[in-house]
Amino acid sequence: MLQDSFSYTVEQFADLQILRYRVPGFENLPLRRKQLIYYLSQAALEGRDILFDQNGKYNLQIRRLLEAVYIHFKGDRTSEQFFALEVYLKRVWFANGIHHHYACDKFVPAFTSDYLEEVVNSLPEEVLPLEEGETCQAMCDKLFPVIFDPSVMPKRVNQSDGEDLVLTSAANYYEGVTQQEAEAFYAAQKKADDQEPVMYGMNSRLVKENGHVYEQVWKVGGMYSSAIEKIISWLQKAEDVAENDAQREVIRLLIEFYRTGDLKLFDAYSIAWLKDTDSLVDFVNGFIESYGDPLGMKASWESIVNFKDMEATHRTETISSNAQWFEDHSPVDARFKKTEVKGVSAKVITAAILAGDLYPSTAIGINLPNSNWIRSVHGSKSVTIGNLTDAYNKAARGNGFREEFVYSETERQLLEKYADITDDLHTDLHECLGHGSGKLLPGVDPDALKAHGSTIEEARADLFGLYYLPDAKMIELGLVPDAEAYKAEYYSYMMNGLMTQLVRIEPGCTVEEAHMRNRQLIARWALEHGQAEHVVEMVNRDGKTYVRINDYAKLRMLFGKLLAEIQRIKSEGDYEAARQLVETYAVQVDPVLHAEVLQRYRSLHLAPYKGFVNPVYTPQTDAEGNITDVHISYSEGYAEQMLRYSRDYSNL
C-alpha cells in the first residue's frame, strides 16, 4: 500500500478523531517473526475486558447493553436520540468505560433515560447482558443512575487536594476501603530497609468485607482468571516461535507471573525483559501504569506488540550511548545525580498492535520498567513509536491549527522546518534520558510524593529534554541540523502548556491529567519566573492571545533552574514542595483565556484527542493447519473493529 494513497483518518465524533497507522516493513519479515507478532497480538486482544472492568465496575455491563441496542434495535435508527446513543457508545469504546479517557469526568449522555428504557424493553431478553437471576428491570434500576445521575461515580480518578481520593474515584481498584485504610494496608507491608521492594498492590483490587481488608489478586484462579488464561494460551504459542532463548525466558516468566500473581516474579520478568535487547520483535503485556489509581499503586492492563525500526533507532542509540555525559552535565545538584548511569536501551519501534490502556488512545514513547530499584540497578528500556508519530503528523498536515495559534510567520517557519525533528528528539530525550536520570537519596520512599508523584516525574523527564535540546552536544552528535532547531520545540511547548492544551478541558474544569499538569506547571513557572526580563510573554493582537518568546537562551536557563528544583523534590521526597508547585502552577485554569482558546479551536473543527484502530492480521494456513503466512489489512472501520473485539475477545 503506497504511503500517499494511505488513508490515515477514519472518522471524527465528540472530541475524538480516529486514525489508522501503517505497519511498514511487516510484509518483509520472515514467517517466524510474522507468526510471533500474530500470536502476541492475539494475546494482546484477549485482555480488553480487564481494562474496562478496572476503569469502573459497571463498565462491561453498560458496554454490552449499549452494544445490544446498537446491533439489535429495530426501530428508528435515524432519530436524534439514537444518534446520541451511538456517539455515547463510541465514546465508551474509546475510553474503555463511561469516564473520559483523559479528563476522567463521566460522560453526559445526550439521550434520555426514558429513551434508553424504551429501546431496551423493545429488545428480546436473550440479547441483553443480564447477570444470573437478574431481570431487565433490575438491570435498568442498577445501571441507569450510573449512566444518567451526575452525582453517581462522577470521576474515574479524583486528585482533588483534601478529599478521600479512594472513596471519590470511580475506578474499580478499591471496594469498601477508605484512602487511609488503603495507605495503612500497604504501609504495613513495606520494609524500610528493603533494597529490592516489589511494587506493592500493583496487581490486585483491595477489598474490605466484614471489617476484613484483603487483596483480590489478578491471576489464574483469582480475579480476571478467564481473560488471563486466554492470554497465557497465546503467549505459549509465542514462546514456541520466540526469536532466541532470552525472549523465550521473558515469555516464560510472564506466564509464570500471570499464573501465580507473585510480584517477585514480576520483577524477575521485568529484568529479563529489560536485558533482551537483541530481539527484533518485542512486546509489553500486563499490569503496567498506575495513572488510573488515585494513589498511584494499582496498575491498569495494557499491551503493545512491536518490532524495531532499524534506521530510526540509530538516533536513540546515539543518545543512550552518551547518557553518562548528559547526567554529568545536567544543572542538578551533584548529590542527586547518578554516579553511574545504568544503560537505558533505546530504540524506535513500529507498533503492530495496541491494546488495553494503550488503545485506542496511546502513548508515543514508553520507558519501562516502573520499579525504582530495577531502574537504578539494571537500567531501563525506552522506546519511541515511530509509525504512530508519523500517522499523527500525516493526519494533521494543513489543518489550520498553526495559522490560528502561532504568533507570527517567523515561528510558523521554525515549526514547519524543524518541528517533526525536535518533537521526536524531545520524546527521545524524555524517555531515554529524562526518566532514567537522577536518584533518590537513601531511605526516601519512592511513593513519597503520593498523588503528585506522576506529575513531578513527567515534569522531570520533560525538563531534562528541554534543557538539552539547545545544547551544542546535540549538533556535535548530529541529532539536530543547526543551532536554531530547538526553538521549534521551545515555542510549541510553551504555546501548548500555556494555551492550546486547554482545548482538552471542559469549561469550568481544572487540569487533572498528570502529563497536562506537568506541561502547564513548566510553562506557567517559566512565564512567571521570566516576567521581570520579559523572557516569555502572553500578548494580545487583534483581540487574540498569543505566546511570544523574546529570549530563548534565558528560557533555557529557567528550564535548568526548575529541573534542579524538581530533581531535589523527587530525590528528597519533599511532598510539601511538590504539592506547592502543583497547586500553584499546574491545576488552575484562567476561565477567560480558556473560553477564548475553545472558541478559536472550535472554528477549526478539529478534535483535541486522537486514537487509532488496529490493522487486522489474518493467518494463511496449509491443509494441516500450519501458518504459512500472515496477511495485514487496514480496511476495518471503528465500530466494526470494536464490535468484532466485543464478539471475539469478551472474556469476563
Regions inferred by a protein language model and the residue ranges of each:
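N-terminal-proximal low-complexity accessory segments that begin disordered
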Residues: 2-71
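Long, well-structured alpha-helical subdomains associated
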Residues: 22, 51, 466-569
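Contiguous, non-catalytic segments that form substrate-binding/exosite surfaces or channel walls
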Residues: 87, 94-413, 419
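Short, glycine/acidic-rich hinge or "gate" loops at secondary-structure transitions
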Residues: 245-251, 266-268, 444-447, 474-491, ...
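Short alpha-helix carrying the canonical HExxH Zn2+-binding catalytic motif
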Residues: 420-433
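An active-site-proximal "capping" alpha-helix that borders the catalytic cofactor pocket
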Residues: 30, 244, 454-471
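Extended, compositionally biased alpha-helical segments that mediate assembly or anchoring
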Residues: 551, 555-652
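Post-HEXXH active-site segment of zinc metalloproteases
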Residues: 438-459
